[in-house]
């Protein structure tokens, strides 16, 4: 590198022709790029890459998780991609995924924070934080969620109450076609609101609807091409208009909403009475007054609250897939109806206690999650120290994605991997848990809201199946086409909720 710089300087001093200088500069840039991005010895294989751009424009961002499966066939269960100089390794197959997420988890425990996320959140919050900050915030969030009823009857009763509001909202549609997206989102988000803010919102509340609309937009925008380009070229993209600027604006509005809720809590905060997550966080902050080193501050409170809402959107996507699959597979929906009718009837409120007695319904919910595949490549990890995985060398800082798409469609794990088949989770008529089913991830960084999400999914889904038959509109053909965002969700569609006699 020093020799190349010396040669360029000598050329400049010799007064060479401008074209010669330009060619020399280009050659130097290519040489510098090669040195910077050349793959280390014994690095995982991968497809051919373009200079500077890598594999960026060979991937279809809308279907990248499907395109990657072709690379698995060609390069094996461990391969790499280059996105404009950023190396990413894709890990496929249950044994290797368990190595990364469980057995060698300390080597892969961190999250890479992309520029698009760092611009709004820095490295704060629950989802993308790392190190001591992440440990403190996750430990506190888990403890607080448990204190507010996670796994207890009190939180289950909140979910049951919200399920009643959801069924009433759908009854008002009178069996006519409607988009269930925001009704489901209302219900799921109200559970998070009750935990974080200590209150729920009416479905027609204008402020609440604006909040949900902003969240829906950021879910989609963050995966858009312009936002991905911002992750690669932030120093250029920050000056250009586009979806990334809308994303930043939306996050700012969401931060202001949480800030207003925080200010309202401060006005009547009583440390002896903890009403919700914000109160609990304020109490924790009071233990470190004026501390510059504590991770418990207002900035982290706002980011953690937004992360809780963001995690809740996964349940919304699962529920939307669930109703869509029921409308497309009426014979399976009939079996769900029959089981619910025979076990709890049409009037008893579904509860988690009835889950064991409803194995087919439980299997259907799990199959919805498998086929819905809402986190196709899981949440990224980052290598914390130079590591050897399956004989390959992964340098510190390498970004790692675990291929849940391949795992949940693996023909060695599933009898009919590409077909919606609840029998995958049944054995002799009883529900059977599958090791290869990990929609919430596994290990220390598994989804902290897993238990809450499972309760919501079961109670909401069973309550709706108890009251309605879901059918396609007569003038609309339903499909399993998806919309790529932070999660994979169905494309916009309408559905009919026919009240059951």
Curated annotation (Swiss-Prot):
It is an enzyme of class 1 (oxidoreductase). This is Cytochrome P450 2J1. It is found in: Endoplasmic reticulum membrane; Microsome membrane. The keyword Iron applies. Its cofactor is heme. Catalyzes the N-demethylation of benzphetamine to formaldehyde. Belongs to the cytochrome P450 family. It comes from the Eukaryota. It is a peripheral membrane protein.
């Amino acid at each position: 590198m020093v020799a190349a710089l010396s040669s360029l300087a000598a050329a400049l001093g010799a007064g060479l022709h401008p074209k010669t200088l330009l060619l020399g500069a280009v050659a130097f840039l290519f040489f510098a790029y090669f040195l910077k991005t050349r793959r280390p010895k014994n690095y995982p294989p991968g497809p051919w890459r373009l200079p500077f751009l890598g594999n960026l424009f060979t991937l279809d961002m809308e279907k990248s998780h499907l395109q990657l499966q072709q690379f698995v066939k060609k390069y094996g269960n461990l391969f790499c991609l280059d996105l404009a100089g950023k190396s990413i390794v894709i890990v496929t197959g249950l044994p290797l995924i368990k190595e990364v997420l469980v057995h060698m988890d300390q080597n892969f425990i961190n999250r890479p924070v992309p520029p698009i996320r760092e611009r709004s959140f820095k490295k704060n919050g629950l989802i993308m934080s790392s190190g001591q900050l992440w440990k403190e915030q996750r430990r506190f969030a888990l403890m607080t969620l448990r204190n507010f009823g996670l796994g207890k009857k009190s939180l289950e009763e909140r979910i049951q109450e919200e399920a009643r509001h959801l069924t009433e909202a759908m009854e008002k549609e009178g069996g006519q076609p409607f988009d269930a997206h925001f009704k489901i989102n209302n219900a799921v988000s109200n559970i998070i609101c009750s935990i974080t803010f200590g209150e729920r919102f009416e479905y027609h509340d204008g402020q609440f609807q604006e909040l949900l609309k902003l969240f829906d937009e950021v879910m989609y925008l963050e995966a858009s091409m312009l936002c991905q380009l911002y992750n690669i070229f932030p120093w250029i993209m920050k000056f250009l208009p586009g979806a990334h600027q809308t994303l930043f604006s939306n996050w700012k509005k969401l931060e202001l909403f949480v800030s207003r809720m925080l200010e309202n809590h401060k006005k009547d905060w009583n440390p002896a009475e903890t009403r919700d997550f914000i109160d609990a966080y304020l109490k924790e902050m009071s233990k470190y007054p004026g501390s510059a080193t504590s991770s418990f501050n207002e900035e982290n409170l706002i980011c953690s609250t937004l992360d809780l809402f963001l995690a809740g959107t996964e349940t919304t996507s699962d529920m939307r897939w669930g109703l869509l699959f029921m409308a497309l597979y009426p014979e399976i929906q009939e079996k769900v109806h029959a089981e619910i009718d025979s076990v709890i009837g049409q009037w008893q409120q579904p509860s988690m206690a009835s889950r064991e007695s409803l194995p087919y319904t439980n299997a259907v919910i799990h199959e919805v999650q498998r086929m819905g595949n809402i986190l196709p490549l899981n949440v990224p990890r980052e290598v914390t120290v130079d590591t050897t995985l399956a004989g390959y060398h992964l340098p510190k800082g390498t970004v790692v994605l675990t291929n849940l798409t391949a795992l949940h469609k693996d023909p060695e794990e599933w009898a009919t991997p590409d077909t919606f088949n609840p029998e995958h989770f049944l054995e002799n008529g009883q529900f059977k848990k599958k090791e290869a089913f990990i929609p919430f991830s596994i290990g220390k960084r598994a989804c902290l809201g897993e238990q809450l999400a499972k309760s919501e999914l079961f109670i909401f889904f069973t309550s709706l199946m108890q009251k309605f038959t879901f059918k396609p509109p007569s003038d609309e053909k339903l499909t399993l086409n998806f919309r790529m965002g932070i999660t994979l969700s169905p494309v916009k569609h309408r559905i009919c909720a026919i009240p059951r006699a």
